[in-house]
Amino acid sequence: MRGTTRRARWVSATTTAACLALVLCACGGNTSTGSASPKAGGAIILAAGMEPQNPLLPTNTNEAGGGLIMSLLFQGLISYDSHGKSINQVAASITTTDSQTFTMKVKAGWTFTNGEPVNARSFVDAWNFGALSTNNQLNAYFFEPIEGYAEVHPVGDAQPTARTMNGLVVINSSTFTVRLATAQASFPSRLGYTAFYPLPQSAYKNLKAFGEHPIGNGSYMLDGNWVHNVSIKVKRNPTYKGTLVAKNAGVDVKVYTDQIQSYADLLANDVDVVQGISDGVLDSFKADLGSRAINQPSGTTDSLTFPLYQPEWNTASSKQVRQAISMAIDRQTITKTVLQGTSTPATDFSSPVVQGYSKDICGEFCAFNPAKAKALLAAAGGFKGTLEIAYNTDGGHKAWVEATWNSIKATLGIDCSARAYPDRKSLRDPITKGSMKVAFRTSWQMDYPALEDFLAPIFAKGAGSNDAHYDNPSFDDLLQEGDKATTPAEAIKSYQAGEKLLVTDMPVIPLWYANTTGGYSENVSNVKFDVFGVPIFTDITRK
């Protein structure tokens, strides 16, 4: 989703217990403080957003529209500061002696906005719900490291043989343990992601109703009803106990289907914060907004994904076709002219903001080389028909999509066209259902700051965001090898070996690393965007 560096993800095996005691046992700080009395607290911040794809359940939200709302309404065991560093929130401590069994202690005094206490069972029940295959949760994959996942989420169409993971044990109201199938030192650092948020017991009584009106424990609470395709309003949560206390009265997230319109409203000061600038104004937004323009690196990548479940993209020669297409894309020119320097050509499948990023893993296959691209396509037997690229028109993608297929067409001499969908949800629905017929744009905003988060959720077999339906057992083995590693260097070596397989198979073509672009109105101050590319709404105040 979230998405989108991810975090200071690694704790080596030899220092795991000590580091966790120092980093995760202490109550962390942030730019906001729990005891602060917010100034200008009566003001509502007006934000541009997107319609969430699904009902608002943490374990079923894996896209930016819903992810933003989740981050406002819920708080996990940890959060991440503006640089991706882990900060304790609901967690009083997270400790381990072997990087396989972790003891989680929950702080006292936390409540959901309906008055229910946030306790150990709030997390354990939510994670078990998210993992159970019959619940069909998109984020189920994130619980795979936990012992017992295979029983609640078997491969294929098999029915689960258990309803809860035996690796999750509630000790008492404030303590639970998590036992992983294998040692994984980095596990705690992913616990700030949406999938790991707690749920109140009331959620399970009527999940459909809860998805429309979620009850969380975060900095904000829902204010009224979710008005679909119009707005979602949240107000400050008066019982919030964490460090991210809102310095404003709330956020009114207005749903836009056109970035040109949201930008026009920003210039008119009719909206306060915009995340994402339309490609149509990338050449002018810095001049228009001056110091209020945002253009900064973030853990977000843009790519072109192929539906490998369609016969034409699931042949031995189709790998070479995809490699040829990749070499036919003039990334340097597109990022410089169309994207106006707000993106950098990709050289791997991750992001420059994470440890393990590589400048050369993709090598020649991510470099513009018309001669080699033509030769490779010819060796693959050519391409028949029209190469279509699907995209959503509400995200400001038209110009770069057209520039991309024009580059491919001019280089390879094949017919290309764009297939426009009116909004993100319309594009994502057939992708999620596995019924998309053509290649399509994808963007990944990191969930937590680590190399494996650019790989496992997108390319592991059965992963919730494996839009290509990529399936390579050797790749999955390398992911597991990296997860079991006891040092950052060992893990990165395995993950990068997996990336090399991706270069060979090319289920997804890396395009560029996207900067966070955005802006804010003349009416607000203290506006910053985090390493995930998301505004830090709790700090924003009205002038």
Which role does the model predict for each range below?
Residues 47-98, 213-215:
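N-terminal lobe/hinge region of extracytoplasmic solute-binding protein
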Residues 95, 131, 135-201:
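Surface-exposed binding/hinge segments that line
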Residues 118-128, 173-179, 219, 248-250, ...:
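Alpha-helical secondary-structure segments
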Residues 169, 323, 335, 414-427, ...:
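Extracytoplasmic/peripheral linker and loop segments enriched in polar/acidic and small residues
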Residues 180-246, 250:
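Gly/Pro-rich hinge or "lid" segments in bacterial periplasmic/extracellular proteins
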Residues 205-208, 214, 239-284, 299:
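Ligand-site clamp/hinge motif
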Residues 344-379, 395-399:
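Structural transition elements
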Residues 518-543:
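Long beta-strand-rich cores associated with HINT superfamily self-processing modules
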